[in-house]
Amino acid sequence: MLAHYLARYDEGRYARILTTGDIHQTNADRIGITRRQVKTVTYAFLYGAGNIKLGRSFDKLLPEEAAAQKGADIRKAYVAAIPGLAELLQACKTRSERGYANAIDGRRISVDKGHKFLNYLLQGSAATIAKRWMVTINQCMPADAHLSLIHI
């Protein structure tokens, strides 16, 4: 979903890496941390973690002040490493002022805090796609077949 929303700002770069490379390794190389660390940081960042939580996602043992500083440093490096992300975040901040996000299907998702906007947008849109996929597959299946959506 992030690739979809970044595309207008990065000319499809993120999507190309997702489909032809390893986005986590690419980001790790650009930020200067391990692939495992960047995966943890990515999800903390996308789910709206504050600087302390972001810093502790990198190193669980950091005291609060050090975690806040590390989180701020990681946030800055992460945004700088992904072309178009700063612009997407600014658009999210601007749109969050209306109190809702438009999911991929145009449906309104209520957003109570600006830092949650991107997370709500990504997860709401992903849920819409998953639900449509299940309906489509269900229509193609034999009547006695069963279907279950499992998030991995």
Language model regions located:
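Conserved catalytic core of nucleotide polymerization and phosphodiester-bond processing enzymes
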Residues: M1-I150
